[in-house]
C-alpha cells in the first residue's frame, strides 16, 4: 500500500513538472522580419533599352497586406530603396508586399496606375536558445507592376 502511495506521489509530481519543462522547450513567440529593396521599374529587371540596372525607389511606402486589402504593417524605403518590417503575426497567410506609392513618383515616364507587388519567400529561420523565440526571415520574390492594385 505504501509503495502505491509513493508511486502516486511521483506520478503527480511528474505530471505537474511536465508542463513547466515543456513550456521552456516550446517557442512562445514568433518574430517575422521582412526586408528587401524596391527598384523604380515595372519588373525590377535590367532596362531592356539601355541595359542598365533600374534605379532604386527611395521614400516609397511599402505595405504588408494579408487578404485583399488588410494592411498588417507598413514602412518607408530609405534613400537606397531598402526597407525592413518586423511583425509578430504568424502565420502570414495570403500575404504580399505592396508599394503603395505610385511608380510614377520615382520616374514620371512610368505608369501612375497600379502598384508594385511581390509575394514573399522564406530566407531563414532562427531558433533562440533558451528564449523560446523563433525568428523567421522573409524577403520579396520580386516587385512587379500589378495594374489591378491601387
Swiss-Prot record:
PANTHER family: POLLEN OLE E 1 ALLERGEN AND EXTENSIN FAMILY PROTEIN, POLLEN OLE E 1 ALLERGEN AND EXTENSIN FAMILY PROTEIN-RELATED. Keywords: Plant defense, Secreted, Signal. The keyword Protein biosynthesis does not apply. It is found in: Secreted. Probably covalently linked to cuticular lipids and/or trichome exudate diterpens or sugar esters in order to increase the solubility in exudate and the dispersion on the leaf surface. The keyword Ubl conjugation does not apply. GO terms for biological process: defense response. One of its GO terms (cellular component) is extracellular region. Inhibits spore germination and leaf infection by fungal pathogens. This is Phylloplanin. Residues 1-23 form the signal peptide. InterPro entries: Phylloplanin-like (IPR040404). Expressed in small glandular secreting trichomes (SGTs).
Amino acid at each position: 500500500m505504501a509503495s502505491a502511495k509513493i508511486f502516486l506521489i511521483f506520478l503527480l509530481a511528474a505530471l505537474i513538472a511536465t508542463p513547466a519543462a515543456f513550456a521552456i522547450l516550446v517557442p512562445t513567440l514568433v518574430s517575422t522580419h521582412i526586408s528587401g529593396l524596391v527598384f523604380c521599374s515595372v519588373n525590377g529587371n535590367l532596362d531592356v533599352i539601355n541595359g542598365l540596372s533600374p534605379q532604386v525607389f527611395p521614400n516609397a511606402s511599402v505595405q504588408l497586406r494579408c487578404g485583399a486589402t488588410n494592411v498588417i504593417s507598413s514602412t518607408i524605403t530609405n534613400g537606397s530603396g531598402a526597407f525592413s518590417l518586423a511583425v509578430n503575426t504568424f502565420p502570414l497567410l495570403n500575404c504580399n508586399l505592396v508599394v503603395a506609392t505610385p511608380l510614377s513618383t520615382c520616374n514620371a515616364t512610368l505608369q501612375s496606375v497600379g502598384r508594385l507587388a511581390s509575394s514573399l519567400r522564406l530566407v531563414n529561420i532562427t531558433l533562440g536558445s533558451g528564449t523560446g523565440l523563433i525568428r523567421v526571415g522573409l524577403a520579396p520574390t520580386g516587385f512587379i507592376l500589378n495594374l489591378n492594385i491601387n
